[in-house]
């Protein structure tokens, strides 16, 4: 049994917003697609231009990256040298201990018996160095004291030059020179006392060395190879230790430079991100396409190109056609007005007859719209 057909005038209309079943006018569809493609291409080109401008206007990134690479290479090189220096120091230390232990086994107990003499010699040598340093400080304090006294003499001459008037400049200079004399006098007395003290200690250390040398003469001669070798090895170890310390300081400085370069790159990245965020906010606040009226053209000036105006008009038409898919929207219209403002009553009457024929036959609904550019 065949299905019951509906009334002849009943037409099943598409829901608003659904896809249109009928084909869109080929020229309008092409114009809409070309307009959309043009807008996408313009946005892509604008983004690319913005990125190129940012790269061109901010060359600091390349400079900081070069510094970062240099610092990284320097750190790697210095760490390799530091590892080699530490390995050499440990090797020399182990070899020194082995040689000294072997020599101590050969010489026997004379090393321990002669050790006070060599310890006294070491203390006497340190006392001599302290005495020399104290003497230099005392001489410098004496020179400063003499210069301060000379300044006081000059200031007194300036103050007493004019007996009828007291010059405040010379008075201030005299006060300043007097303070310098007092400070220099205190430093001279302090350095003199220190020099006397270390000189006395040096004399005592030298006297002790002489006493031990007389009492331990045979043991000193017998154990001399051991202590001479020990002094040589200590000198070599001190040199390697100084090199290790120097390399450690160099590595620390290189790492500080590397960290500073990373910090600079982070700051540059934050600045670029802030600029991009601000640019995106400004672009979102920009008026939409066609919202602003075109500026009036003055005499002697040319307006915008005809291609640009046509493109904007066609884009608006295509958007309207895509939105007006519902026939109910067309039924509510009492008049159909062309794009140039002229009334199209004949088109409306023709369209009514076509709709009546379509309803009588139950065929598909067709929609014709007059477009005048």
UniProtKB/Swiss-Prot annotation:
Transmembrane segments annotated in the record for this chain: none
Residue ranges, annotated region (Disordered): 1-36, 274-308, 332-373
Compositionally biased tracts (Basic and acidic residues): 332-360
Keywords tagged on the record: Coiled coil, Guanine-nucleotide releasing factor
GO cellular component: cytoplasm
Record keyword Coiled coil present: yes
A Pfam family annotated for this UniProt entry: SH3BP5
Coiled coil recorded as keyword: yes
Molecular-function annotations in GO: guanyl-nucleotide exchange factor activity; protein kinase inhibitor activity
InterPro entries reported in the protein's UniProt record: SH3BP5
GO biological process, alphabetically ordered: intracellular signal transduction
Coiled coil: 35-98, 170-258
Family listed: Belongs to the SH3BP5 family.
Protein role: Functions as a guanine nucleotide exchange factor (GEF) for rab11a.
Name used for this protein in its record: SH3 domain-binding protein 5-like
The organism of origin for this protein: Xenopus laevis
């Amino acid at each position: 049994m065949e299905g019951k057909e509906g009334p002849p005038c009943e037409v099943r209309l598409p829901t608003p917003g659904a896809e249109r079943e009928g084909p869109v006018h080929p020229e309008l569809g092409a114009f809409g697609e070309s307009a959309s493609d043009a807008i996408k291409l313009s946005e892509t080109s604008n983004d690319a231009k913005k990125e190129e401008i940012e790269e061109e206007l901010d060359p600091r990134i390349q400079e900081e990256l070069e510094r970062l690479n240099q610092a990284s290479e320097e750190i790697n090189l210095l760490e390799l040298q530091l590892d080699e220096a530490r390995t050499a120091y440990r090797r020399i230390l182990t070899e020194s201990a082995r040689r000294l232990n072997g020599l101590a086994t050969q010489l026997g107990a004379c090393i321990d018996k002669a050790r006070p003499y060599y310890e006294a010699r070491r203390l006497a040598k340190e006392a001599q160095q302290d005495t020399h340093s104290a003497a230099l400080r005392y001489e410098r304090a004496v020179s400063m004291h003499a210069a301060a006294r000379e300044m006081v003499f000059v200031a007194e001459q300036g103050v007493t030059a004019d007996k009828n008037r007291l010059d405040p400049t010379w008075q201030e200079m005299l006060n300043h020179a007097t303070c310098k004399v007092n400070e220099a006098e205190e430093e001279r007395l302090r350095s003199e006392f220190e020099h006397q003290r270390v000189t006395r200690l040096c004399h005592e250390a030298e006297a002790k060395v002489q006493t031990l040398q007389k009492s331990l003469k045979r043991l000193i001669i017998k154990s001399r190879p051991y202590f001479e070798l020990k002094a040589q090895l200590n000198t070599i170890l001190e040199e390697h230790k100084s090199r290790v310390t120097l390399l450690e300081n160099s590595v620390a400085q290189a790492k500080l430079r590397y960290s500073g370069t990373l910090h600079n790159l982070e700051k540059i990245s934050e600045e670029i991100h802030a600029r991009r965020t601000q640019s995106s906010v400004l672009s979102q606040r920009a008026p939409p396409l066609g919202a602003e009226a075109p500026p009036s053209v003055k005499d002697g000036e040319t307006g915008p190109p005809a291609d640009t105006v046509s493109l904007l008009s066609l884009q608006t038409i295509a958007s309207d056609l895509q939105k007006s898919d519902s026939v109910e929207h067309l039924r509510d219209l009492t008049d159909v007005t062309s794009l140039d403002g002229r009334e199209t009553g004949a088109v409306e009457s023709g369209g009514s007859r076509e709709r009546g024929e379509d309803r009588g036959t139950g065929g598909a609904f067709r929609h014709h719209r007059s477009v005048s550019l």
